[in-house]
Amino acid sequence: MSELEQLRQEAEQLRNQIQDARKACNDATLVQITSNMDSVGRIQMRTRRTLRGHLAKIYAMHWGYDSRLLVSASQDGKLIIWDSYTTNKMHAIPLRSSWVMTCAYAPSGNYVACGGLDNICSIYNLKTREGNVRVSRELPGHTGYLSCCRFLDDSQIVTSSGDTTCALWDIETAQQTTTFTGHSGDVMSLSLSPDMRTFVSGACDASSKLWDIRDGMCRQSFTGHVSDINAVSFFPNGYAFATGSDDATCRLFDLRADQELLLYSHDNIICGITSVAFSKSGRLLLAGYDDFNCNVWDTLKGDRAGVLAGHDNRVSCLGVTDDGMAVATGSWDSFLRIWN
């Protein structure tokens, strides 16, 4: 037997031992524990606003922390800052590259960021003295497309990329301060924990990983999906997270139990998931699908509680406001819808 084959067998045995240890700790299922709880009932949401202005597919959106303004990125080469109450466009920012895949709003409301097939994370200052929006920093360094970005504050941002890495950047110096390596496929999505000390990533190696922002180490790895993970989102208390995959399932993983708690799927759903987000309490999990719908799941019981139907093409992105009062969905039909 070759040395490589021997090592492979040892690794397989170790993995089985870890899985057995996890199973030994798993003395009950989430469905059993929540069996006495009331169901959330039928969730019906209506479209309250439709944001029209993009001329091509919308690829990404992100709410500002005021729960009123949001940023969206489209294949039309524009980044638009919207007032969701009035549907007015506060800013329409022309991008140097129209192949944008992600956008983010800084917690302060002073900056937005975007990136995509240009491999660069571009930071835009919304609060310039002249009143015009301009690029304040460009962060080159990834060797693959930029799939997701999220601000820690006005001076730091975390990015994920098709080069299989994530990175923490010092925006002022435009330097990567930490690189997070460990995935063996394109990293598609990231989600910051509520305390901003860790983040979780989902990738095309069908695994999700928990990273410590301070030292760059991978703290935990989670498997279970059988296809690319397109979206991840932290549970509001920071102790769990959800994933959405091309295998047509969403899954809930618990950090303390170190394993999957629940799978969200339906026989009628055979298409991939593009985006996931929790309600403010965490009781509902919203997921955007390739079949033009957004499904609402009862997080604790695993039942489908509702459907947001209205888009005429793939739902590519969604987000819940910080105050929990509204959901925004963005679609390849070029429209954003605000629901509650």
From Swiss-Prot:
Protein name: Guanine nucleotide-binding protein subunit beta-4
Record PTM Phosphoserine, positions in chain: 2
Record-listed Phosphohistidine modification sites: 266
Tissues where the protein occurs: Strongly expressed in lung and placenta, whereas it is weakly expressed in brain and heart. Abundantly expressed in the axons and Schwann cells of peripheral nerves.
Modified residues (N-acetylserine): 2
Extent of the WD repeats: 53-92, 95-134, 141-179, 182-221, 224-263, 268-307, 310-339
Quaternary data: G proteins are composed of 3 units, alpha, beta and gamma.
Gene3D superfamilies per UniProt: YVTN repeat-like/Quinoprotein amine dehydrogenase
Organism listed in the record: Homo sapiens
UniProt entry keywords in alphabetical sequence: Acetylation, Charcot-Marie-Tooth disease, Disease variant, Neurodegeneration, Neuropathy, Phosphoprotein, Repeat, Transducer, WD repeat
Coiled coil, from the record: none
Gene for this chain: GNB4
